Amino acid sequence: MTPKLSFLKTVAKKVMPEFAVGGYHFLMALAAAAYCRFPSRKIKVIGVTGTNGKSTTAMMIAAILTQAGFKVAVSSSIEFRIGGRVWKNRSRMTMPGRFVLQKFLRRVADENCRYAVVEVSSEGIAQHRHRFIRFEAAALTNLTPEHIESHGGFDNYRAAKGKFFAACRNIHVINGDDPNCEFFAAFPAVRRYVYGIRHSFSDRIGAKKITATRAEFSLGGSSFESEGVAFKLRLPGEFNIYNALAAIAVARSQGVPPEACRAALESIGTIPGRMEKVFAGDFEVLVDYAVTPDSLEKAYETARRGLAGKLICVLGACGGGRDRWKRPVMGHLAQKYCDRVFVTSEDPYDEDPDRIIQEIADAAANAIRITDRKEAIHRALAAAKHGDRVIITGKGCEDSMCLAAGRKIPWSDKDIVLEYLGKSR
């Protein structure tokens, strides 16, 4: 988005009454769907929403449906996919704008895909991007505080997610171990699936239960049993067991047998930028997208498992005045789990990067503050010894950094790591 367009949108939001803004978004959603001839009527669209795990869950669902013999498309914050063709999502948007998304679904329908798996964001829901899309199923990964300032509180954030479930009345897939389970279970659905590990969901919820037993996880992978089938994933962490269960529940709602789910999930080696091990030698280096306190804590917990040496982290926080509340929380988590902490810039937008760094580092007593992200990564790698583990969070597989005045520069945490280690060896 150009600086001029961004300015005009900001002014419009301030001068237009709230109902007019909502009406504008609704009409734009209708116009986009009509222009593209309502493509979702020709395909089955699976919507995946939640705070964390949407991209991984969407890719897991796509892998299972493909394994089952269907032609599948994906719209995620990582990539777009139609059958075997894949291209990177460079928009920095979890859920594309109305016309982009409807045009994508039109292509999906025209290329005879049976399914489209779409990430659904709270911002997208607030702007009616989900409207006039006929969703076969709505799946919830989890819900933790995020986008609090833009929504005006957690209850409003949860309510935004709820609008998606209210709009999709066919199949609902809900994380039964999430504290918000019963809120989402209250929305009417033809069929409801509840998944979990801890079996904490209430029997009052009328739903088919997809549960995991004998769940074990580490940085090297995870395993569990469900419906009498043993699953062994190469993806790390307990959070990926939850992501897998969500994907299994969606697949089972479409009649896919458990064995096909197992074969597909066990074939997934890595998800780009999601606890991705980019180097393994004397020490290990992980790159992860974690941008919320919940996802950051889970990443650190997983990274500490089986660790002989020290855990060294590089982290930042997004600028633009967004979710400032979480900056000290993330600094505290880094201090709690990591032996050495490097706080740096992430995507400052128009905000002073040094102020963002200060708000994080003030909660981490021994944090080293380095504004230049490349230098911070180099310093962390230089500090790593035999048996240590370095985890770099916040960017994942993103290929640009957002600076002031709408400027973007090419970026890759992974490439910076590999370039440095290649030169230092």
Question: For each of these PLM feature ranges, what is it?
Answer:
Residues 1-9, 15-22, 246-273, 277-425:
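ATP-dependent carboxylate-amine ligase
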Residues 7-176, 182-191, 245, 251, ...:
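Phosphate-binding loop of NTP-binding sites
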Residues 41-43, 109-111, 135-285, 308, ...:
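Acidic, Mg2+-coordinating active-site environments of NTP-dependent enzymes
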Residues 51, 77, 175, 197, ...:
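Cofactor-binding loop segments of dinucleotide-utilizing enzymes, especially the Rossmann-like FAD-
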Residues 76, 120, 176, 196, ...:
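Short loop/edge segments at beta-strand edges and connector loops
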Residues 76-79, 228, 269, 394-396:
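Short, small-residue-rich loop/turn micro-motifs
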Residues 80-82, 124-126, 179-183, 201, ...:
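Short, active-site-adjacent cap segments at secondary-structure transitions
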